[in-house]
Structures are given as C-alpha cells and as structure tokens.
C-alpha cells in the first residue's frame, strides 16, 4: 500500500507531502521542475556537494497552485531559513534574495538545460565508489533528476536500518523518495526492494512502473534538516549492510493518478 507521496518542486530543497498526484513518463507532475543554477559554474546547485550547498536543506518549496499535465509549470513559494517567504512570480529580485542567503550567486531556473550537471562530494567512508573527492555528474537532458524520474522506498527498509543502527534517526525525509510503500518483509528480504529490480509494479488501477535499479546513496542522507541531526553513521550503515543502496529507481510505463492508500502489486 502507498503510505506517502512526496514532490520536490526545487531540487535539493525540502518539498511537499501529497495526498495524490498525477504520474507521467516524466514522474510526478512538477517534481524537480525547478533548480538553482550556480552563476559561477553553470552547474545545478545540489546538496550532494554540501561544502557549497548544505544550506539548501534550510529552504522549503511548494507550488502556489497544483501543477497540471500538459500545462506550464506554475510558480512556487519558497520559505527561507528565517521563515520569510518569496514567490517566483512576484519577487523580481528572487535570484538576489536566494543568493544573499546562500552566500553564492544563483538563479532560479526551470528544467530546460540540454546538458545539466552537478557536483558530488564523496566523504571518506568505506564502501563508496570514491572517497574524499568531488566529482562532476551529468543529469538526463532537460531534467533536474539525478538518474531516474521515480524513487521508491519501503517501510521495511527504513525499519531494518533502524534495527541495524538504533542510535541513528532513520526517517523517510532523509532519503527524499517520491513514493513510500508499506511492507512487512523480514529476514533475508530486509531490503526487499533489491528483489524488485527488473520487475513491474502496479499501483492502484492504472499506474505501472518498471523498477530499473538500486538507489545508491550519498552524503545528502547524513545532513541536518529540520530537527534531524547531522549523522555520518547513517551513510556508514547503508554502506556496510546494503552496498550503499536505499530504495530503488523506477520508470513509468503507464501513468495515472496516484493516491495515498493505493494498492501495490508486484509482478510474480
């Protein structure tokens, strides 16, 4: 069963939890529709490089009006760390406003870059593909997705991680999924999503997803956001017990409206 649905209007900012949303081959309508672009480098601002962009987690973005299929992306409201709000359709100086808070020159853009890319910082943790290094990473053209349009996570994976590292606060918002599915898996299938890769998943009556691969995690899941503390132990646990993966990526084979409470059926 679908227990929560999440959309992030601006890449790497906190997003919004939804009761329902339309899903197309480009993911949840409006997800990662905007991003901040570093005026110095031209790269997408991403909390994957917290040395530059950790403050992004102090911002929250929501749509003023719900985005609709086949319509222009609506404007957004951004709540700044001090609680004040700015509106993309009203504040002519929004780039200056955001740049001043972040301490770097940025401009707010929609997802229309032909070759978007971002920087990723790899901490010195055993099991990561790189260690103590910053790399440049390409993104799919004209999107602000890292790899895939949908990230799916199960409750059983979160619960298992809590058992493995009880000192850590494993909460859904650390992992920024689009869809959270209730699961009671146990034993050898603690990370049950691993066995879903390559299979189809039907949600509700209309939606069909193809699970395309594991979601490899990065330093973002260790960063503070709201009342969640900084904790490198989160990433260390994920690296030690599940090859740095939490959840899976998916493509959309057939779209439709997804609701909280929808049934979820995995193909045999």
Language-model segments: residues:
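Metal-cofactor-dependent catalytic cores
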Residues: 1-268
């Amino acid at each position: 069963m679908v227990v929560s649905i999440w959309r992030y209007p601006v890449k790497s900012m906190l997003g919004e939890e939804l009761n329902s949303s339309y899903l197309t081959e480009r993911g949840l309508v409006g997800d990662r529709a905007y991003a901040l672009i570093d005026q110095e480098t031209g790269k997408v601002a991403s909390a994957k490089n917290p040395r530059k962009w950790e403050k992004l987690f102090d911002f929250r973005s929501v749509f003023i009006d719900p985005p609709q299929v086949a319509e222009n992306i609506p404007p957004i409201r951004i709540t700044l760390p001090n609680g004040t709000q700015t509106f993309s359709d009203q504040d002519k100086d929004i780039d200056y406003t955001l740049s001043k808070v972040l301490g770097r020159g940025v401009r707010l853009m929609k997802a229309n870059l032909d070759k978007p890319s971002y920087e990723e910082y790899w901490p010195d943790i055993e099991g990561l593909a790189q260690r103590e290094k910053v790399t440049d990473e390409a993104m799919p053209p004209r999107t602000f997705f890292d790899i895939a349009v949908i990230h799916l996570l199960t409750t059983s994976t979160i619960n298992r991680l809590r058992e493995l590292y009880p000192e850590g606060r494993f909460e859904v918002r650390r992992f920024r999924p689009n869809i959270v599915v209730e699961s009671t898996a146990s034993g050898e299938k603690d990370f049950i999503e691993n066995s879903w890769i390559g299979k189809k998943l039907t949600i509700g009556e209309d939606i069909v997803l193809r699970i395309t691969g594991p979601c490899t995690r990065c330093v973002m899941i260790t960063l503070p956001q709201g009342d969640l503390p900084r904790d490198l132990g989160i990433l260390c646990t994920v690296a030690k017990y599940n090859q740095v993966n939490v959840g899976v990526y998916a493509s959309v084979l057939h779209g439709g409206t997804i609701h909280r409470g929808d049934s979820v059926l995995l193909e045999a």
